[in-house]
C-alpha cells in the first residue's frame, strides 16, 4: 500500500530584490521536509517559485529603469539559480507570470466566487508599500509605519475572502 501524496511549498518569493538568507532558510526548511517525506515513502510534490506582481515589483523595476516583465525575468532567474547552489530538491518552479499559473488562479478564483467565498467591498487605511501592510492611526509613529516606512492613505474597492464561512470548519480543525 502506498502512502498518500504530500505537498509542500515555499512562499512564492517577491522579485523586488535579490534572494537573501531568509529565502535560503525557508527553501532549505521545505527541502528537508520534502526529503524526509520521500525517504518515508510519500509521493512528494515540492513547489517553489516567484511572485511577480505588486507595487513593490513595479517600483523596483522603475528604479532599475526596466519594464516590470524584463526586471522580473532577471530577478526570477536569481531565485532559480539559488536552488542548485543549495542542492534543493524541488519538483517544480512556478512564476506568477506564467500562463499555467494565470489559468489555475482564474479557475480557483471563479470557483471561490461562484460559491460565495469571495465578495467585493471597499476598504481604506494607511498603507505601507514596503511592509505590504495597513496600519491604524494609533499605530503610526510620526506619520510613519512602526517600521519607519512611509505610509499613504489608500481607499479602493477590492475583493475579500469570506473567512467567516469557514469558521466552524477551522474551529474543528
How would you label these PLM feature ranges?
Residues 1-173:
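N-terminal, positively charged nucleic-acid-binding surface of large information/translation enzymes
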